[in-house]
Protein backbone atom coordinates (compact mmCIF):
# COMPACT_ATOMS: atom_id res chain seq x y z
CA UNK A 1 0.00 0.00 0.00
CA UNK A 2 1.28 3.46 -0.87
CA UNK A 3 1.26 6.30 1.69
CA UNK A 4 1.63 10.06 1.23
CA UNK A 5 2.95 12.58 3.77
CA UNK A 6 0.37 14.72 5.54
CA UNK A 7 2.43 16.33 8.28
CA UNK A 8 4.98 15.97 11.04
CA UNK A 9 4.15 15.94 14.75
CA UNK A 10 6.47 18.58 16.19
CA UNK A 11 5.24 18.82 19.78
CA UNK A 12 2.45 18.25 22.25
CA UNK A 13 -0.14 20.95 22.96
CA UNK A 14 -1.38 21.19 26.55
CA UNK A 15 -2.16 18.19 28.73
CA UNK A 16 -5.31 16.82 27.05
CA UNK A 17 -3.65 14.74 24.31
CA UNK A 18 -3.42 17.38 21.58
CA UNK A 19 -0.44 17.59 19.22
CA UNK A 20 1.06 20.32 17.04
CA UNK A 21 1.44 19.24 13.44
CA UNK A 22 3.45 21.01 10.77
CA UNK A 23 1.33 20.11 7.75
CA UNK A 24 2.46 19.40 4.24
CA UNK A 25 -1.00 18.31 3.18
CA UNK A 26 -2.81 19.81 0.25
CA UNK A 27 -6.20 19.39 1.95
CA UNK A 28 -5.57 19.77 5.70
CA UNK A 29 -9.23 20.27 6.61
CA UNK A 30 -10.12 17.00 4.88
CA UNK A 31 -7.10 15.09 6.25
CA UNK A 32 -7.76 16.09 9.86
CA UNK A 33 -11.57 15.91 9.79
CA UNK A 34 -13.05 14.02 12.74
CA UNK A 35 -13.10 10.31 11.90
CA UNK A 36 -10.35 10.50 9.26
CA UNK A 37 -7.91 7.59 9.23
CA UNK A 38 -4.18 8.33 9.13
CA UNK A 39 -1.05 6.25 9.58
CA UNK A 40 1.80 7.03 11.98
CA UNK A 41 5.39 6.46 10.86
CA UNK A 42 8.36 6.75 13.23
CA UNK A 43 11.52 8.82 12.68
CA UNK A 44 13.03 6.03 10.54
CA UNK A 45 9.89 5.99 8.34
CA UNK A 46 8.72 2.64 9.68
CA UNK A 47 4.97 2.09 9.96
CA UNK A 48 3.85 2.38 13.60
CA UNK A 49 0.03 2.26 13.66
CA UNK A 50 -3.21 3.59 12.22
CA UNK A 51 -4.99 6.35 14.12
CA UNK A 52 -8.36 8.08 13.93
CA UNK A 53 -8.71 11.85 14.24
CA UNK A 54 -10.91 12.95 17.16
CA UNK A 55 -10.52 16.72 16.74
CA UNK A 56 -8.73 19.38 14.72
CA UNK A 57 -8.20 23.13 14.85
CA UNK A 58 -5.76 25.65 13.40
CA UNK A 59 -3.49 27.73 15.62
CA UNK A 60 -0.98 30.06 14.00
CA UNK A 61 1.12 27.96 11.58
CA UNK A 62 0.14 24.62 13.09
CA UNK A 63 -2.69 22.16 12.88
CA UNK A 64 -3.66 21.02 16.38
CA UNK A 65 -5.00 17.47 16.32
CA UNK A 66 -6.11 14.84 18.78
CA UNK A 67 -6.37 11.09 18.22
CA UNK A 68 -9.41 9.09 19.27
CA UNK A 69 -8.84 7.34 22.60
CA UNK A 70 -5.74 9.36 23.52
CA UNK A 71 -6.78 11.97 26.05
CA UNK A 72 -3.61 12.73 27.98
CA UNK A 73 -0.14 14.03 27.20
CA UNK A 74 1.34 10.72 28.40
CA UNK A 75 -0.56 8.89 25.63
CA UNK A 76 0.95 10.94 22.82
CA UNK A 77 4.34 12.24 23.94
CA UNK A 78 6.08 9.30 22.22
CA UNK A 79 4.76 10.54 18.85
CA UNK A 80 6.93 13.69 18.76
CA UNK A 81 8.92 13.55 15.52
CA UNK A 82 6.57 11.00 13.92
CA UNK A 83 5.15 11.56 10.44
CA UNK A 84 1.45 11.38 9.62
CA UNK A 85 0.56 9.82 6.29
CA UNK A 86 -2.60 9.05 4.36
CA UNK A 87 -3.00 5.82 2.42
CA UNK A 88 -3.87 5.93 -1.25
CA UNK A 89 -7.23 4.29 -0.49
CA UNK A 90 -8.21 7.28 1.69
CA UNK A 91 -7.53 9.88 -1.01
CA UNK A 92 -10.70 11.36 -2.49
CA UNK A 93 -11.32 12.06 -6.14
CA UNK A 94 -10.53 15.61 -7.19
CA UNK A 95 -12.30 17.98 -9.53
CA UNK A 96 -10.87 18.86 -12.94
CA UNK A 97 -7.82 21.11 -12.54
CA UNK A 98 -7.15 20.00 -8.94
CA UNK A 99 -4.12 17.92 -8.05
CA UNK A 100 -2.52 16.30 -5.05
CA UNK A 101 0.95 17.57 -4.18
CA UNK A 102 2.51 14.17 -4.85
CA UNK A 103 1.18 14.39 -8.42
CA UNK A 104 2.83 17.79 -9.01
CA UNK A 105 6.20 17.35 -7.30
CA UNK A 106 8.63 15.94 -9.86
CA UNK A 107 6.85 17.25 -12.96
CA UNK A 108 9.01 18.94 -15.61
CA UNK A 109 8.33 22.61 -16.33
CA UNK A 110 8.46 24.10 -19.84
CA UNK A 111 8.01 27.58 -21.29
CA UNK A 112 7.47 27.68 -25.07
CA UNK A 113 8.71 24.05 -25.25
CA UNK A 114 12.00 25.03 -23.56
CA UNK A 115 12.81 22.97 -20.45
CA UNK A 116 13.00 25.18 -17.33
CA UNK A 117 13.39 22.67 -14.49
CA UNK A 118 11.56 20.27 -12.18
CA UNK A 119 9.04 21.06 -9.45
CA UNK A 120 10.70 20.12 -6.17
CA UNK A 121 8.39 21.62 -3.55
CA UNK A 122 5.07 23.39 -3.04
CA UNK A 123 4.74 26.34 -0.66
CA UNK A 124 1.51 27.70 0.85
CA UNK A 125 2.28 31.34 1.66
CA UNK A 126 -1.25 32.68 1.25
CA UNK A 127 -4.08 32.72 -1.26
CA UNK A 128 -2.25 30.67 -3.91
CA UNK A 129 0.22 27.81 -3.78
CA UNK A 130 3.73 28.56 -5.04
CA UNK A 131 5.60 25.89 -6.96
CA UNK A 132 9.37 25.78 -6.40
CA UNK A 133 11.16 24.83 -9.63
CA UNK A 134 14.72 23.48 -9.36
CA UNK A 135 16.80 24.73 -12.29
CA UNK A 136 20.18 23.62 -13.55
CA UNK A 137 22.89 26.17 -12.66
CA UNK A 138 20.40 28.83 -11.49
CA UNK A 139 18.52 29.73 -8.36
CA UNK A 140 15.18 28.04 -7.77
CA UNK A 141 12.25 29.68 -9.56
CA UNK A 142 9.08 30.44 -7.59
CA UNK A 143 5.93 30.11 -9.69
CA UNK A 144 2.51 31.07 -8.31
CA UNK A 145 -0.20 28.55 -9.20
CA UNK A 146 -2.42 31.04 -11.05
CA UNK A 147 -3.93 30.82 -14.57
CA UNK A 148 -1.74 33.46 -16.26
CA UNK A 149 1.40 31.57 -15.14
CA UNK A 150 0.42 27.88 -15.15
CA UNK A 151 -1.05 27.23 -18.59
CA UNK A 152 -1.37 23.44 -18.59
CA UNK A 153 -0.71 20.54 -16.23
CA UNK A 154 -0.42 17.07 -17.76
CA UNK A 155 0.35 14.59 -14.99
CA UNK A 156 0.36 11.64 -17.42
CA UNK A 157 2.99 13.33 -19.62
CA UNK A 158 4.97 14.51 -16.55
CA UNK A 159 4.77 18.08 -17.88
CA UNK A 160 3.68 21.58 -16.87
CA UNK A 161 3.55 24.42 -19.40
CA UNK A 162 4.02 27.92 -17.99
CA UNK A 163 4.31 31.55 -19.04
CA UNK A 164 6.83 33.23 -16.76
CA UNK A 165 5.56 36.74 -16.12
CA UNK A 166 7.97 39.66 -16.02
CA UNK A 167 9.53 39.98 -12.59
CA UNK A 168 9.15 36.32 -11.59
CA UNK A 169 12.59 35.28 -12.84
CA UNK A 170 15.23 37.51 -11.26
CA UNK A 171 18.01 35.78 -13.25
CA UNK A 172 16.81 37.08 -16.64
UniProtKB/Swiss-Prot annotation:
One of its GO terms (cellular component) is cytoplasm. Gene3D superfamilies: PRC-barrel domain, RimM. Its main location: cytoplasm. It is found in: Cytoplasm. GO terms for biological process: ribosomal small subunit biogenesis; rRNA processing. The keyword NAD does not apply. Residues 95-168 form the PRC barrel domain. The keyword NAD does not apply. InterPro entries: PRC-brl_dom, PRC_barrel-like_sf, RimM, RimM_N, RimM_N_sf, Transl_B-barrel_sf. Keywords: Chaperone, Cytoplasm, Ribosome biogenesis, rRNA processing. GO terms for molecular function: ribosome binding. An accessory protein needed during the final step in the assembly of 30S ribosomal subunit, possibly for assembly of the head region. Essential for efficient processing of 16S rRNA. May be needed both before and after RbfA during the maturation of 16S rRNA. It has affinity for free ribosomal 30S subunits but not for 70S ribosomes. The PRC barrel domain binds ribosomal protein uS19. Belongs to the RimM family. Binds ribosomal protein uS19. HAMAP family: Ribosome_mat_RimM. This is Ribosome maturation factor RimM. It comes from Streptococcus uberis (strain ATCC BAA-854 / 0140J).
Amino acid sequence: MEFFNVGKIVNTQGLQGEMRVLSVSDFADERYRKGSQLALFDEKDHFYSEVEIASHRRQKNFDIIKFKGMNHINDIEKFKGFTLKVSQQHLSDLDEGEFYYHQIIGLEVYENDVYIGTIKEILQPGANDVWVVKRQGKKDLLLPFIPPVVLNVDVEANRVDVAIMEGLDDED
